[in-house]
Regions:
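Structural motif
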Residues: 5, 80-82, 112-114, 144, ...
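Cysteine-nucleophile active-site neighborhood
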Residues: 302-378
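Residues that mark the start of a beta-strand
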Residues: 3, 28, 248-250, 276, ...
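A short helix->loop->beta-strand "cap" motif at the edges of active sites that frequently abuts
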Residues: 109, 167, 324-328
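Internal gly/pro-rich beta-alpha loop/helix module
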Residues: 121-242
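ATP-dependent carboxylate-amine ligase catalytic core
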Residues: 2-13, 17, 24-107, 115-141, ...
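Phosphate-binding active sites in nucleotide-utilizing proteins
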Residues: 240-324
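C-terminal and late-domain segments of enzyme folds
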Residues: 217, 244-247, 259-269, 362-451
Length: 451
């Protein structure tokens, strides 16, 4: 089994494109994404046919990170990990700052650095040398240059990089607008929007041409290090007592264009614990699947499907009836929004949603930066866990009776900022935070046993 990590020198360097090309070029790839992003893993699945897992040094301790990596590579030939932001960018300026470099050291994985070569010559060697010297425990084994106008220029830049840094160049990406993907909140389209499309077919052809003509695939594969994939799900002590614990129970997972943000490790944990996962679409289906013990609404883009969600009256009624019958319901971000009364859009349109939580949400034209990023969470049950927030909306009207329904989450960021959020009503829990179950298994057990 081989492993390699693709990082950018900075955001926008081209690491997602390079990762996608390499995932398309090699066979039977186990894809991974550093950090909490949901969109890139969807692309990984498009180009590999395999599920992608998030590797997050903030949400996971080192043993958990290694566990998710080792279980995620089972049966594959090569693990390709896509980084996040720039190689050393994380929280603060310590080297253990939950960055791509931090993850690479935990996993002892070689790094290929993608560098934007636009408008630069010999100075690119100084840039690469700085990355090499900044942390000698990060194994930068190769460089791929992006935005290169010609092979002649690439060879010129390659000479400078290799002469002054001792790190070999492994190829380049030519300037080509067709390599880019349109923006959508987190920076990309959702992968399902491209599935079976002509755009995807053309992109795969282009990726193949670039891989064959511009990248040294043989050397990249040689640089990727061998490692042992010992240990399965049931050998990880924090979850060993969960094996088949909930066998016979059924969880409905909302899955469509409006709700698609799920950590694959969360779903793996559900399957390991014996839960039967049944997917359904609040956009298309007329009612919930039968005999559910838990309904899981992940994040996504309900604002793009507000009309379909609003007009699907029978689905909303089915969800309200499940709530009245005591079925456990858990919602994150977009899923939380769907469980509220109404979503108000910027253009004046609105969607009437489930209304279980007597709250109105309003979209904003910019990121809610005050409540953005990694968060430490303490629940009303004194369970401490971790997650993140990322949303372009906010609560505009809150008619919930606070005497009966205090906020369930106490949030604190590493910089000391804090707030409360989340709504707990009967057997429903929902709020803006996206939560990794592996951050604290007790939270996962709470959803199944005590909610």
């Amino acid at each position: 089994m081989k492993k390699i990590l693709i990082s950018g020198a900075m955001s926008g360097s081209g690491k997602t494109t390079v990762s996608s090309i390499l995932m398309s070029a090699f066979e039977n790839v186990a894809p991974f994404k550093v950090g909490p992003d949901y969109i890139d893993p969807g692309y990984h699945e498009l180009f590999t046919g395999n599920k992608s897992h998030n590797l997050d040094a903030f949400m996971f301790d080192e043993d958990t990170l290694k566990h998710i990596f080792k279980t995620g590579v089972k049966g594959r030939n090569i693990a390709i990990v896509e980084g996040v932001m720039g190689l050393y960018d994380g929280i603060g300026h310590e080297k253990d700052n939950f960055s791509t470099a931090h993850v690479s050291r935990i996993l002892d994985i070689p790094v290929i650095l993608v560098v934007n070569a636009k408008g630069i010559s010999t100075s690119i060697a100084a840039e690469v040398l700085g990355f090499k010297l900044f942390d000698k425990n990060v194994k930068i084994k190769g460089i791929i240059l992006n935005n290169v106008s010609s092979e002649k220029l690439y060879l010129n830049l390659k000479e400078a990089v290799e002469r002054f840094t001792g790190i070999e160049c492994l190829g380049y990406l030519p300037k080509n607008d067709k390599l880019s993907v349109e923006s959508r909140h987190l920076g990309l389209k959702q992968a399902f929007e491209l599935k079976d499309s002509e755009e995807l077919r053309e992109k795969k052809i282009l990726f193949k041409e670039i891989a064959e003509n511009c990248l040294n695939l043989k050397r990249i594969y040689e640089i990727a290090e061998e490692f042992e994939t010992d240990g399965g799900m049931d050998e990880f002590k924090p979850i060993e007592n969960l094996k088949n614990k909930y066998k016979g129970k059924k969880v409905g997972v909302a899955r469509d264009g409006a709700f698609s943000f799920y950590y694959e490790a969360n779903l793996d944990l559900m399957r390991f614990s014996g839960l039967e996962i049944v997917e359904f679409s609040p956009v298309r289906d007329r009612k919930l699947p039968d005999n559910l013990d838990l309904i899981y609404f992940g994040g996504g883009y309900p604002e793009l499907y507000y009309k379909e969600l609003s007009e699907n009256v029978s689905m909303k009624e089915s969800i309200r009836q499940a709530y009245e019958n005591g079925v456990k319901i858990y919602g994150e971000c977009g899923g939380f929004i769907y469980l509220t009364k109404r979503l108000n859009l910027i253009d004046g349109n609105y969607g009437d949603f489930c209304g279980i939580i007597d709250v109105e949400i309003s979209m904003r034209n910019k990121l809610n930066i005050g409540r953005f990023g990694y968060i430490n969470i303490e629940t009303g049950e004194r369970i401490k866990t971790k997650g993140h927030e990322f949303h372009y909306s906010e609560i505009s009207t809150d008619n919930e009776n606070k005497k009966d329904n205090t906020h369930f989450y106490k949030i604190e960021k590493n910089d000391g900022r804090n707030w409360t959020c989340g709504y707990k009503k009967k057997s429903l829990l929902a709020g803006y935070p996206h939560i990794s179950f592996y951050s604290n298994i007790e939270f996962f057990k709470y959803l199944l046993e005590k909610l």
